[in-house]
Amino acid sequence: PLMLGEGATQLVKNAAATAEQLDKMCEMFNTMGVTVTFEQENMLNEVIPYAGSAPAYLYAYADAFVQSAKQHGIDEDDALTLICQTMIGSAKMLLRRDKTPAELIRAVCSPGGTTIEGMKVLEDRDLYGIVSEACDKCIKRAYELG
């Protein structure tokens, strides 16, 4: 994402840098996406799964959709085009911040419809727990690596 100017960079405010220097750093990193600053250095470990490692997790999610689409006779390139554009549009909806992720999910899930059936599988398989565990393991490893 950074190579495309769509990354997410994290910086720590500390006594070694002036506010002006921090602003300059943010300005520089903002040319590659967005920058979030934290007060405590340990937050750099805590944020790794949500920015640094997240692309791999999102690629895996996209790949799972592509593999499923192929099983249903959809061309791989077409499937990738569909899921990529859907991810872009969904991310833009989230960035508007006028609805929470839960509200957006409810807006897409018609009672008795197709989407709700798929969501039931994600809930039954504990998607939220799986994501939480992956993030916890990532953070734990970040601390181990120092």
Regions found by a protein language model. Give the residues of each.
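Active-site PLP-lysine loop of aminotransferase-like
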Residues: 1-2
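Internal alpha-helical scaffold of NAD(P)-dependent oxidoreductase catalytic cores
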Residues: 8-46, 57-96, 141, 145
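Short pre-catalytic strand/loop immediately N-terminal to key active-site residues, enriched for Gly-Thr
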Residues: 43-49, 101-106
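NAD(P)-dependent Rossmann-like dehydrogenase/reductase catalytic/cofactor-binding core
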Residues: 81-146
